[in-house]
Amino acid sequence: MSVGVSTSAPLSPTSGTSVGMSTFSIMDYVVFVLLLVLSLAIGLYHACRGWGRHTVGELLMADRKMGCLPVALSLLATFQSAVAILGVPSEIYRFGTQYWFLGCCYFLGLLIPAHIFIPVFYRLHLTSAYEYLELRFNKTVRVCGTVTFIFQMVIYMGVVLYAPSLALNAVTGFDLWLSVLALGIVCTVYTALGGLKAVIWTDVFQTLVMFLGQLAVIIVGSAKVGGLGRVWAVASQHGRISGFELDPDPFVRHTFWTLAFGGVFMMLSLYGVNQAQVQRYLSSRTEKAAVLSCYAVFPFQQVSLCVGCLIGLVMFAYYQEYPMSIQQAQAAPDQFVLYFVMDLLKGLPGLPGLFIACLFSGSLSTISSAFNSLATVTMEDLIRPWFPEFSEARAIMLSRGLAFGYGLLCLGMAYISSQMGPVLQAAISIFGMVGGPLLGLFCLGMFFPCANPPGAVVGLLAGLVMAFWIGIGSIVTSMGSSMPPSPSNGSSFSLPTNLTVATVTTLMPLTTFSKPTGLQRFYSLSYLWYSAHNSTTVIVVGLIVSLLTGRMRGRSLNPATIYPVLPKLLSLLPLSCQKRLHCRSYGQDHLDTGLFPEKPRNGVLGDSRDKEAMALDGTAYQGSSSTCILQETSL
């Protein structure tokens, strides 16, 4: 789940060139090519099925007919990128199992979207999450949110395509640009032609490939070192099994509180308001199916985290028994997993290819989701509002053209990434930097009825400035920091971003480092608190500006865009207390939207099927007393 968070310094274009390379067998190439062919076939099947009868709603929203399980697996695959597949085992190998406590944040990180964001978005019948911003604020705020999202995804998708290809090239000699082009072209074709339905079903297939590849490594690796019991014993003997680190200091990179609570805000920025995920919720048959798909992600996320952590422990136990070569130990940390896989599986034709297919499945799922979501927001937020007269056929052609265009842009960004060198780490971090302010913008609109458009715009800008100040300052500071000594098994590693003295001294108690002070300490804020810090900045600044500019006076407020925090809290009180407060109803499900006409979707009003689906979930927003709305607005 660690999207945008590489646990080590990113690969440089020259890293690993002096390290001995392993080679692929014919069977490995067959397995890898089979992944690409099957992914392309799934996309072409959905493109050819019903060719000529496709609608924009089918292309961008899978005709809002997707079931719970495929949506859940697609939600998981969207941000289970190759960066996480390489980064999580590397984190566990170098620093121990403290990162495993990230699983504690998944419960709230998925429960909140299921019961707050999904009901609001689904009942407004949106296509783009940023339509909400226009309904709540105005068109300017919508455009600002859309442009911010496009910037976030365009920067990130090039890195997601380039980084695993570079790692594969450094370890196996597999041609760098051949793999980049193959992935980019295959992904662009099936996303542009097949639309969201093709993306979701290829995500399902690629998720299975990811789990198979990782399980193969765990099974063979644990058998090689004497079983999982032996793996755990070796890791425990060398201090890699971490207990609860209860230090409340937010400047410590990984503690229980940082992982369990700071991680919640990171999860909300991904599963609550990111267009790629919101689009999947909205493609579900009913609101209930969307909520269930969000619930279903929880066990899958836990299994995914456990698998990544187990690979790190197996790798540690393996290299205790079969030490790395000096050249391998000096490679970039994110290459450790690939070296381990090639060392472990080199005598088993096809299995190295299966793991590489697993790695590139992570890239394909992330990139295809990016293409589809970018095409959707560009079409719905930047083009259709200005050209509402587009015919269905022209809109379909333009949507596919946008997906193709973003595919070419992704290849261009991959080339730019190859020229970045150390700046590549900043590009990877941008995804996390931008997610927090966008989360804050949606929370400002949803939970604070007094927030107005000027407050939203100024708050978003303040959040982005704060995000880039801390994020880039952290990267620059870490580049100039000293390197810690090698761990006990003789391999070396680089000091990761904002790693503080508390973490290092836990692993290496004989080594001391001076504590950062002043701005340097400010920059050492754990990356898991970035979303919380930056979203809070947006909310605080947005509220201050809103209060100074007259709140929502003279502007209409659609109650369907507000999540009724106060009524929800009051509904927990005894009925007698509720009567004394003169509130008849407190639920979000009882807001009256009769004053606000139904929003057209893709240029037309919802059809009978949509109304039937809404009836299955219960009638939304009916019959509230005005008292509740006034009380909520008074917040």
From Swiss-Prot:
Impact upon substituting T78A: Reduced membrane localization. Decrease in biotin transport
Outcome reported for the amino acid change (mutating C309A): No effect on biotin transport
Reaction equation(s) it catalyzes: biotin(out) + 2 Na(+)(out) = biotin(in) + 2 Na(+)(in); (R)-pantothenate(out) + 2 Na(+)(out) = (R)-pantothenate(in) + 2 Na(+)(in); (R)-lipoate(out) + 2 Na(+)(out) = (R)-lipoate(in) + 2 Na(+)(in); iodide(out) + 2 Na(+)(out) = iodide(in) + 2 Na(+)(in)
Phenotypic consequence of N534A: No effect on biotin transport
Impact upon substituting N489A: Slight decrease in protein levels. Decrease in biotin transport
PTM text: May be glycosylated.
Cell compartments where the protein resides: Cell membrane; Apical cell membrane
Main function: Sodium-dependent multivitamin transporter that mediates the electrogenic transport of pantothenate, biotin, lipoate and iodide. Functions as a Na(+)-coupled substrate symporter where the stoichiometry of Na(+):substrate is 2:1, creating an electrochemical Na(+) gradient used as driving force for substrate uptake. Required for biotin and pantothenate uptake in the intestine across the brush border membrane. Plays a role in the maintenance of intestinal mucosa integrity, by providing the gut mucosa with biotin.
Protein name: Sodium-dependent multivitamin transporter
